[in-house]
Amino acid sequence: MTDVYQHIECRWCHGQSPATSTSCDRCGAPLDIRDSVTEGGWRQAPQIRDLTEIQSGSSVYQLDGTVVPIAEVNLGEGERVFFEHHVMLWKDEHTAMSVMDMPGGAKRILAGMPFVLSVATGPGRVAFSRDAPGEIVMLPIDPGVRLHVREHAMIVASANLGYSFEKVQGLKAMLAAGTGMYLDSFTAGDQPGLLVLHGYGNVFERTLAEGETVQVEPGGFLYKDAAVTFDISTQKLDTGGGQGLQAAKGLASRGFAGLKAARSLMKGGDGLAGVLSSGGLQTAAAALTGPGITLMRLTGPGRVGIQSMYMEHGAA
């Protein structure tokens, strides 16, 4: 039997495993993960079983928990990981700790980003948690690959990954994209690295072909390959409300009492009752008078990762 039949390639991380394996030896993902996709092309991030050992260098990573999961790292001698200090849950007493200065400190402070990162050096164990419901995913990054990630989504990363940030271009994109002023950027050099992210809700991924686009709710964006570009588009809404819509606008201008009447008027007709009942005066007025909804338009080629629970910039 030739070598090609003795191994199977993981479609998630492209690692090679024996043909009889049911999960990837490198990242722990089920080897048939690409067989389970929606008609829209999305697949759920690999459901790595609790306490599955994932090797990166001489360190071992494990995930545990469901509602608020944790990532535990058993660091090899001299191996390091970096992270934001507030996500560390516990560590062995002898695990060495230090800090790593980040370039552009003043800009990062103004943008609400950390200007120093914590570093743990092995040997020893250290565990991390976002202290929020969601899902933790492990993303192997191959040499030469660069990944853009939503601010504050990183849980921990192997120290052989280059970490920087890239400014979101354009005022409209910065204000509307929901990602803040910057995107985190992670790059693998000569050696592969491992990036651990937290997504609110569940995490899904789709691979876009060259020139293929998808429009995403800005709060749902989590990560993308660097080759994937994005801009902001406004989708105009046709309410079909006619005179009823104009009457609702007039009622909404009268304050909360008017909003209640507007809600009754619009209920079942224009789909805005839920907004009126939960969004408050400002949101309701914007919904009634605004030109449309803002979406993040991503264009391939490359991977796009989303989280199913929308989070505004700055939420943690």
Residues covered by each model-derived region:
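Composition-driven recognition of glycine/serine/threonine/acidic- and proline-rich low-complexity segments
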Residues: 3, 7, 11-21, 25-316
